[in-house]
A protein has these predicted regions:
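Conserved anion/nucleotide-ligand pocket segment
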Residues: 150-201
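Rossmann-fold NAD(P)-binding glycine/threonine-rich loop
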Residues: 65, 101-113, 122-141
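Active-site-proximal loop->helix
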Residues: 16-25, 44-45, 125-140, 156-159
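A short helix->loop->beta-strand "cap" motif at the edges of active sites that frequently abuts
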Residues: 2, 50-53, 72-74, 113-116, ...
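Residue-level signal for inorganic ion chemistry
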Residues: 10, 46, 94, 114, ...
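Short acidic-hydrophobic, aromatic-tinged amphipathic segments that line or gate anion-handling sites
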Residues: 55-57, 75-82
Length: 201
């Protein structure tokens, strides 16, 4: 059985991971769940997955989270220091799904204490990529991208000789222009292009 930590369990990637783990309970043991502000979802996930440690990033919500989990035997903490402490708990797999720069420090710490760092936090590579990769090498931690586009590239290159790859062309999924007629694409403005239906561009 593999021990797992999920950072950002109430976000998009974290929620998908939780769904998968609920169907694989015999293969995985969730040790750590962390969320940002969504205490109801975090409490629900905790009751289903029964992690040892639960962390809410927003320390002001710690009391409310504890109230939702009265009667359950969890180590419940809150705030940045609690997140960083949770990242230092040794696990087989650490999923880093915290959004934005807030996830960088957790990724750097988790790289020291996990066998596999499943990275959805792009900022960790953009802001600290050289350091993160060095920490992974020093600790024999596998760095696996799990965010959509990065994971697709990783999967395509798996088993290939990277030295033979001259360039990678990554096509878009459509964004705001998925159903736009070809003739109408000629008049698209930058403002329209940044109006993605799901993500703030």
């Amino acid at each position: 059985m593999k021990n797992i930590s999920i950072f950002g369990s109430t976000g998009s990637i974290g929620s998908n991971a939780v769904e998968i783990l609920l169907n694989q309970k015999n293969d995985f043991n969730v040790l750590v769940l962390t969320g940002g502000k969504n205490i109801k979802e975090l409490a629900k996930q905790a009751i289903l997955l029964k992690p040892k440690h639960i962390v809410i990033a927003d320390h002001e919500l710690l009391g409310d989270l504890k109230e939702l989990l009265i009667g359950h035997d969890f180590d419940i903490t809150g705030g940045k220091e609690a997140l960083l402490n949770a990242a230092s708990i040794p696990v087989d797999v650490s999923l880093q799904g915290i959004i934005g720069f807030a996830g960088v420090e957790c990724s750097l710490i988790a790289a020291k204490y996990s066998k596999i760092l499943a990275l959805a936090n792009k900022e960790s590579l953009v802001c600290a990529g050289l350091l993160l990769k060095q920490i992974c090498r020093d600790n024999n931690t596998a760095l696996i991208p799990v965010d959509s586009e990065h994971s697709a590239i990783f999967q395509c290159l798996n088993g290939e000789n990277i030295k033979t790859v001259e360039r990678i062309i990554l096509t878009g999924s459509g964004g705001p222009f998925l159903n736009t007629k070809l003739k109408d694409l000629l008049t698209i403005t930058p403002n329209q292009a940044s109006n993605h239906p799901k993500w703030n561009m």
